[in-house]
Amino acid sequence: MTRKIVDLARSCGILYLMLFIGEWIAHHLNIGIPASIWGLLLLFLGLTFRIIKLDWVLCSASLLIRYMALLFVPVSVGVIKYADVLFSQMNVLLLPNIVSTFLTLIVVGLLSDYLFSLSSFSHLRKKVARKQAEKA
């Protein structure tokens, strides 16, 4: 039990440290990127370059993920509270969302078509087609 408490404290401490450093960066750079994004970027880089071990943050990260739905309740209430502002700005909000969705679909479709046309994928497709032909 004591070990779990120590792991949770260390895990929360690391996450808060990343957030604190993100706050410092956001305050001093002042380029419009929120401190939480800086903190997440630092956490990602720390995990990627193995400066921070996954086991060190796993305890509090899994706890936060478990209760993530509860963390979104205040945001949802805020959206409902300011629904009139959202509806008045709907044309500004809706157009970029629709355009970015279609652009994402097009780029992913073209990229997947290109990747499947490569020789390694076409070789695998031919192999699967032969196996299906043998079964029939």
UniProtKB/Swiss-Prot annotation:
Keywords: Cell inner membrane, Cell membrane, Membrane, Transmembrane, Transmembrane helix
Pfam families recorded: LrgA
Bilayer-spanning residue ranges: 5-25, 29-49, 67-87, 92-112
Membrane topology: Multi-pass membrane protein
Main localization of the protein described in the UniProt heading: membrane
InterPro entries: LrgA/CidA, Uncharacterised_UPF0299
Subcellular localization(s) per the UniProt record: Cell inner membrane
One Gene Ontology CC term in the entry: plasma membrane
Record family assignment: Belongs to the UPF0299 family.
NCBIfam families, per the entry: PRK01821.1
Name of the molecule in the record: UPF0299 membrane protein PM0880
